[in-house]
């Protein structure tokens, strides 16, 4: 069982005509790096675009002191950070658009595009997918945005959007696998 994880200490949800908003926060790196992490997500009302902003920040005086000490003692230009977006094994992912985006092809034929604001390095790396009922993990990939947090606040913006030429109604569910209502 995986138990080494940060605990989400704040969660806010709201729905607007433009879409749904979700805010999450944890202070999982406060003790070691003086950084807390928040993620703002906005899902468009038509479901075709997810916009995210991840913020790593030293917010309290104690966090700022810890972050400064880490930077000074290590003579660092910044603390190494990585945002990881794990993909399902059935998703075919490829770096696209001159290294500025990742194209994601689903079994259904849907194409989605992951983009970022350019403040970090974009890469695809190996990962594993843990599935209930399977004894062994399945090999997969993850999108990684990596860089340095060199200030008290570092923001990284990204989007996951359905490609324009993909029809609205396609779904990757196999109708034969869906349960039949009784």
Enumerate the language-model features and the residues they cover.
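CBM-like, beta-strand-rich accessory domains located in the C-terminal region of large
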Residues: 1-182
């Amino acid at each position: 069982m995986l138990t080494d994880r940060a605990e989400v200490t704040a969660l806010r949800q709201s729905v607007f005509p433009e879409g749904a908003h979700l805010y999450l926060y944890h202070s999982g790196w406060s003790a070691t790096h003086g950084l807390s992490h928040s993620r703002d997500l906005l899902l468009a009302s038509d479901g075709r675009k997810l916009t995210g902003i991840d913020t790593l920040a030293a917010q309290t005086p104690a966090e700022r002191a810890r972050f400064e000490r880490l930077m000074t003692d290590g003579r660092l230009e910044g603390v190494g950070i990585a945002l990881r977006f794990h993909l399902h094994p059935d998703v075919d992912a490829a770096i696209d658009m001159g290294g500025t985006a990742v194209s994601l092809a689903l079994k259904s034929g849907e194409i989605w595009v992951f983009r970022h604001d350019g403040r970090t390095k974009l890469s695809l790396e190996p990962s594993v997918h843990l599935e209930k009922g399977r004894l062994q993990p399945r090999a997969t990939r993850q999108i990684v945005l990596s860089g340095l947090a060199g200030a008290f606040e570092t923001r990284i913006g990204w989007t996951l959007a359905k490609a324009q030429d993909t029809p609205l109604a396609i779904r990757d569910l196999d109708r034969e696998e869906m349960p039949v209502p009784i």
